[in-house]
A protein has these predicted regions:
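Cytoplasmic helix-loop-helix junction between adjacent transmembrane helices
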Residues: 99-138, 329-330
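C-terminal membrane-cytosol helix-exit motif in multi-pass small-molecule transporters
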Residues: 174-195, 385-393
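Helix-loop boundary and gating motifs at the non-cytosolic
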Residues: 2-50, 220-225, 230-248
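Structural signature of the two symmetry-related core transmembrane helices
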Residues: 71-85, 284-299
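Juxtamembrane intracellular "pre-TM" segments in multi-pass secondary transporters
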Residues: 1-3, 189-222
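Helix-loop-helix hairpin linking two adjacent transmembrane segments in secondary transporters
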Residues: 133-185, 372
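Paired small-residue
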Residues: 94-102, 296, 307-315
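Central cavity-lining transmembrane alpha-helices of secondary-active solute carriers
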Residues: 47-61, 260-272
Length: 403
């Protein structure tokens, strides 16, 4: 196993995710507000980059299987480095949406391909190494968001924000993205990564790779469990703060602590759970994780105090770690090494669909039925997905955690 390459990829991933998070929350909604956007328009500006991922993660992964990981990863890092400069020229909401769509190519290209490289070199430790890579990315996201908010506050706050305020922030986004690109170039030019296939026409290999991976019910089922879990996570991110403040009567700071507790639990537990899945199998951890998410998610509308809500968030975070530490590694276990890029692209696409649909589905259900029924129905979806997963994985022919 090439630990030096994985460590370098984690460092690149931290810088890239820090840059991306700095550009997104809370700076992006505030920039859209400054440009005169209303609530619905702000939501589109925030979510449009996820749409990029839904449509382009799978093709990006498949392309990396053909032309090689190195070139594809560098293309993704170029989006991290150079797209942020376009924010300097934004003077309308429409331009902001267009730039956000372009910025989404950064994670759409780099994310699945970097995961494929980790899977390429991790050997029997796929669960642990993919979890470390993911946890470091989460750490970058955690660091970027508050730094963005702090910069806006220091530069005049929301009420005193000007175009210069956002230009300064996006200048730092660009510098950090350039740092990720430079470190990536240094790493990828020195290390050997998968070179891509050589037989047949590129178009034929592109189509056959996508057909082979997306036609495997086991890959789709494993990815779907991540998608379902991310649907509940997306709903929780959107509505837990609102519920905590408006129903439970907590402060905004306490609501932020609930979210932080969940994310930190996931980040710390993922490598441990990934290592466990390498030695003891992945299917059982995924099932346990779905249950671990479903129970506290259903109970949240019945809770009114900070302590009980915080404990529920910790359990949900642990469940998220159980699912996410095993699902990507299971997808890699089920695929031939030449198709790791396509597999991670399919995985990332379903991930994004789940995460994007969570706030939408949750919003409709909360609006129609209230928190109790809404959270209960989404919890039932988590539980109902378990028999589907077990049936799809039966007789999968893979020795879990040892592939």
């Amino acid at each position: 196993m090439n630990t030096h390459l994985i460590t370098a990829l984690c460092s690149v991933g931290f810088l890239a995710r820090f840059s991306y998070a700095l550009a997104r929350n809370p700076v992006l909604p505030l920039f859209a507000l400054y440009l005169g956007a209303g609530p619905e328009a702000i939501g589109l500006a925030v979510g449009i980059s996820t749409v990029t991922g839904i449509f382009f993660k799978m093709p990006a992964g498949a392309i990396s299987d053909i032309i090689g990981r190195r070139r594809t990863m560098l293309a993704g890092l170029c989006f991290f480095a150079f797209v942020p400069f376009l924010y300097f020229f934004i003077s309308s909401y429409e331009a902001l949406v267009a730039v956000r769509f372009l910025h989404g190519f950064a994670t759409a290209i780099y994310g699945p391909v970097a995961m494929a490289v980790v899977a390429d070199v991790a050997g029997a430790r796929k669960g642990e190494m993919l979890s470390w890579f993911s946890s470091v990315a989460i750490l970058g996201t955690l660091a970027g968001a508050p730094v963005g908010g702090l910069l806006v506050s220091l530069l005049g706050g929301v009420q005193g924000a000007t175009a210069t305020t956002f230009h300064v922030v996006y200048g730092i986004v660009a510098v950090t993205g350039l740092a990720a690109l430079l470190l990536g170039v240094k790493t990828l030019l020195k290390e050997e990564t998968a070179a891509g296939a050589v037989q047949g026409s590129r178009w034929e290999r592109f189509v056959s790779g996508i057909r082979e991976v997306s036609g495997d019910r086991r890959v789709v089922a494993a990815s779907a469990m991540e998608g379902v879990q991310n649907m509940s996570m997306g709903a929780l991110e959107a509505f837990l703060p609102v519920y905590a403040v408006t129903v439970a009567g907590l402060s905004a700071f306490e609501a932020g602590l609930l979210w932080a507790g969940q994310v930190v639990t996931t980040m710390l537990a993922k490598p441990l759970m990934g290592r466990f899945s390498d030695g003891h199998g992945r299917n059982g951890l995924i099932v346990a994780g779905l249950l671990c998410c479903a129970v506290p998610f259903a109970l949240i509308p019945a809770l009114r105090d900070f302590t009980s809500l915080f404990l529920a968030c910790l359990v949900f975070g642990l469940g998220e770690a159980l699912v996410t530490s095993s699902s990507a590694a299971l997808v890699a276990d089920l695929c031939k090494a030449r198709n790791y890029g396509t597999a991670m692209g399919v995985f990332g696409t379903i991930f994004d669909i789940g995460h994007a649909s969570g706030p939408i589905v949750g919003g409709v259900l909360v609006g129609l039925l209230g928190y109790g029924w809404a959270f209960g129905i989404m919890s039932l979806v988590l539980v109902a997905s378990i028999p589907f997963f077990i049936a799809a994985m039966r007789g999968n022919g893979v020795q879990e955690g040892q592939a």
